[in-house]
Structure formats: structure tokens, C-alpha cells
Amino acid sequence: MEAMAPRTLLLLLAAALAPTQTRAGSHSLRYFYTAVSRPGLGEPRFIAVGYVDDTEFVRFDSDAENPRMEPRARWMEREGPEYWEQQTRIAKEWEQIYRVDLRTLRGYYNQSEGGSHTIQEMYGCDVGSDGSLLRGYRQDAYDGRDYIALNEDLKTWTAADFAAQITRNKWERARYAERLRAYLEGTCVEWLSRYLELGKETLLRSDPPEAHVTLHPRPEGDVTLRCWALGFYPADITLTWQLNGEDLTQDMELVETRPAGDGTFQKWASVVVPLGKEQNYTCRVEHEGLPKPLSQRWEPSPSTDSNMETTVIYVILGAVAMIGAVAIIGAMVAVVRRRKRNTGGKGGDYAPAPGRDSSQSSDVSLPDCKA
């Protein structure tokens, strides 16, 4: 099996978590682990990344020249040498655990040694505005598919297939869920509080979005209105198109919130509307950095009006040209068919193309909880 890039795997894990984003006013501590085997190229690569809310704050990469847990946010540079030594030790323990797990799972699935395989893990906790635990989680995947997950009760596991059932049985005998629950309810919450205090100038800020609407003509004659929200933090935001005050959630195209690369985020939502009816549609923007929701409409400029008239003319001319082309092609086909009937000729056959079908916690990285 071809290995996916570690960054892609981390993004997949993040995407898998997207439907369960934290509530407004809450905060999260999450770790994403990825191990990729590479036969013939040395030991598996192991990457660990930690996030507080939507901000990456630590990273470990076994392929680095000097593999160590390193700060990824400036406020984490306040931690002393003991912290980084302990976090590096924990990351290296996980690296060894995953080397064993890759071999173990390859055996569970009866896979050859020649292929490359991946293990992914995400674990962490969400806390409310009062600092109490809202949710704890651990999810594991193998070769991009669900493998095993801790249930919401923090006591039981859901195994995706026969191999994961073996792991579940091992973890149940080791009472691993009890220790993991203790970490999620205690250590995870405590360290999240510490990180929020260290990075409060960054993590607890609220940057309101800058919003505007753009218009994009379509060949069909109608137009797309796209509502943009830029430069906001935190990432939680709601964009809703409305027609005369009624939500159009079923008719919208909505992209996932994306990092802008400067510590803020961006997002857009679009809707297709009849030409000339643009002013009936409004985009509602809700974000904790706004004192009240924004309502945005497309605001045409004089040059835009001229461009729209030109667009309408082009659309009409294009339609006329298309009709004319269809008529010409139809006439040519008719002539060819008459000639074939007169000459008794047959068209050539063709074959269609075939289808393509650590937090700082030692109680989580326990060696007796391998797969």
C-alpha cells in the first residue's frame, strides 16, 4: 500500500474531528500522532503534533536531525528545559510503541512486509468556560480507516473490525480505559488550563471577521454570490445565506474553515441566485468577536453594473452561437448519414475506455497498551 504524506494524515485526522468542534466559549487540548512504515528506507517515521484550540503549539518529528519535542507557538518558549526533556522522552516512547504496533497490525491483517502502512491517533479533552470537562476522546485509524475509538462514556471502546476487536480485548483486560479516563478528566484538563494561561494573549483573543460579498456570473445565466469572512480568530464561525430573512442552509455551498497562515482563519459560503435578484439575498455572519451578527449584501459599483450588462450580452450571444453551432452540426450529421445510406458504408466500431473502478503525562503512554 502506498503511504500517504504525514501532513495529509494529520489533516485527515483533523477533518475527522471537525463535526465535533468545541462549543463557543470552550477550549480543547488535542494531540495528533502519525506513524508511517517505509520498508527498505529505515525505521517508521513518527510525527506528534499538539493543538490548543486551533493553534499548533508543539511538534515532534523522528526524521529531524535532532528529534525533540519543539515549541510551535512563541508563548511555549516560556517552558523550561525539564518540560522539553520530559515531552521528548514521552514522544520517543510513543515512537517505539508505534513501531511495535505497525508490526502487530500487519500481522492482524495478514499483510506482507513489503508494503507501507500508517497508524493515526487523536486524543484530548474539551473543557467549558468554567474549566470543567465537556468531552474526552481517543480515536485510532489504520491505513486511513477507523480502527478503534473510546466511547463518550470514557469506559468502553468501539472496534471497527475483527483486528480492532483483538486490541479492544487486550485493552479491556489491561483496564486501559480507566487510566485513560483519569488522564482525560485530570491531567489533560490541568495542562489545558496551564497552556491557556501561558498563551492567553493569543489563545483568548477574539479577532472579528472582515466580511464582504462577491458576485460571479455563471454560463447558465444566473450568478453566484459568495460571502467571505477573513482574518478572524478563533475558528468557530457561522455563515448563513438568507432570502428575505429565511435561511437557505440547504442551498448553500460551504467550505471548511481554513487557516490563513497568520494565526487567523478564513471561510466562505456561496449561493446561486437569479440574475437581477441579488439584493434580495443577505449573508449573516456570527462570530464571538462581533458585538452582534453582521448582515452583508452584494454592493454593486458603477463599473460592476457596466460589467454585468456586458456579461448579459455575452451570455445571450453565447447562447445564440451555441444554437447556431448545434444546427450546423445537425445538418452535417444528416448529410453524412445520407451519404452512408447511398454508399452502403458503415461507421467504424469503437471500444469505450474501461472504467476505473502529551500532554505531559506518563499514564497515557503505557507500554502494556500496545495494539
From Swiss-Prot:
Glycans are attached at residues 110, 280. It is a single-pass type I membrane protein. Residues 299-311 are annotated as: Connecting peptide. Residues 25-114 are annotated as: Alpha-1. Residues 25-311 are extracellular. Keywords: Glycoprotein, Immunity, Membrane, MHC I, Phosphoprotein, Signal, Transmembrane, Transmembrane helix. Residues 115-206 are annotated as: Alpha-2. One of its GO terms (cellular component) is phagocytic vesicle membrane. Residues 1-24 form the signal peptide. The modification Phosphoserine is found at residues 362, 365. Residues 337-371 are cytoplasmic. This is RT1 class I histocompatibility antigen, AA alpha chain. Heterodimer of an alpha chain and a beta chain (beta-2-microglobulin). GO terms for molecular function: peptide antigen binding; signaling receptor binding. Residues 342-371 are annotated as: Disordered. It is found in: Membrane.
